[in-house]
């Protein structure tokens, strides 16, 4: 049984730049850093960045960070002041802010739960949607 995200690993062009972004901009707790990689804690999930080539197009590939609604507006304002690049506008339920890290990884701040997403989907999504719960 899957209990949640264990970790997420992304390729980055510059480990030091990524390290500064995740610690100084997002406030993640650093675990380790080397020339080739760095690890951070985001709540109970760990994130690894590894020096490597980036794909040109990742479609909707991204990682969402859970955020309390009471912190959403303040956090988005901070990110905008720090000139992060927004890559997508939110088109679904809940509050979400989609943005890029310095290496172009696609991220999201999301203020909703799986339960509310399921409820929204069951009420609004049509077509070939199969629900298993």
Regions of interest found by a model, annotated:
Residues 1-16, 63, 119-133:
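N-terminal beta-strand motif that seeds the catalytic metal site of vicinal oxygen chelate
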Residues 29-61, 69, 106-112:
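Conserved short beta-strand elements that form part of the metal-binding/catalytic scaffold
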Residues 5-12, 54-78, 81-133:
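Vicinal oxygen chelate
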Residues 14-29, 75-79:
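Amphipathic alpha-helical segments
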Residues 14, 35, 91-94:
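Short beta->alpha linker loops
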């Amino acid at each position: 049984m899957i209990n949640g995200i264990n970790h997420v690993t992304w390729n980055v062009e510059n480990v030091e730049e990524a390290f500064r972004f995740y610690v100084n901009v997002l406030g993640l707790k650093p675990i380790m850093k080397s020339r080739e990689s760095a690890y951070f804690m985001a709540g109970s999930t760990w994130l690894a960045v590894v020096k490597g080539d980036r794909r040109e197009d990742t479609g909707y590939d991204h990682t969402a960070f859970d955020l309390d609604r009471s912190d959403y507006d303040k956090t988005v304002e901070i990110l905008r002041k720090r000139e992060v690049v927004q890559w997508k506008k939110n088109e679904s339920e809940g509050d979400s802010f989609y943005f890029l890290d310095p290496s172009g990884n696609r991220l999201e701040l999301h203020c909703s739960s799986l339960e509310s997403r399921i409820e929204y989907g069951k009420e609004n999504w049509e077509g070939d949607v199969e629900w298993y719960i």
